[in-house]
Amino acid sequence: MKKLTLLVLSFGLFIACSKESGNSSSENLSTTTILETINSIAFEEDIDALVSESMSLGSNVSSARSADSNADKGPKKFKGDKYGDCATVVEDEENNIKTVTFSDDCEGKRGQVRSGSMIITYSETQGETGSFRQVTYDNFYLNGVKIEGIRRTEILSVDDSSKTMLTTVSDGKMIYEDGTFKTRESAMTRYVHFENDKKTYSTLSGSKSGISTEGVEFSMEITTPIKFVYDCFSTGERKRGKVPVEGIKVTTSGDELISTNFGDGTCDTLVEVTKDGEVETLDLKDIKRGERFKNILKRKKK
């Protein structure tokens, strides 16, 4: 049994998921394909947060070197070792490049494990309309999944309370531990709202296309923006991190179509998946890559 990884969107959690071999079905859009589209959104949100924090390193970070006159030029660490004490950032100011390196298997405070490097190139100005940052990867793994491709983010508009950005991914690939891989191309628009200089929520819209690890060609479109809140309460318990609470995405392969609804604003890991009028509620904490839907795909094609 191969161990694979699913990043649960809410609460920044990762869970190990199994994929059974030989579990075939006549349907193209299996649980695996749907989960992998969710997984890629989650990975993108994680990488976006990491890149943003690496770009803002300054007075709120500590130097990885001893305190001397050259310390400010040395590798930097994230505040509170959020991404692990083995995560460092080196900046080449002359060429506008930052390199984020995770030595060995570097475990962050929320359990995410990273290794390898992310190379970030950026425009001379930052935080203004038209400014950009671009990410490439050098043997980079996020919780056992190898990430490849070119990720570019450009600011479309900005004001005192919000920022709108366009992120494109080209030649994207997610390679799982069993050697299977998913390819993707995407263009996503992210809107971030601020209150008192703190992020309160963001929305994500856009589309992507690719081939799943099962060899299924698919396209995915967010038809109702996915809303992420940064601090919310559920059954009296405070949930930290970026939590998806609303939004609908539609995944299509050939003449098959499945929609995924992220909810009505409640902070949980439940999603509703709909195909041909049949609805199934799934808990992202419990489902696994390679499993089949219990209800909506129980009828085989004739």
Model-derived features: where do they sit?
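C-terminal motif of bacterial Sec signal peptides marking the signal peptidase cleavage site
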Residues: 15-16
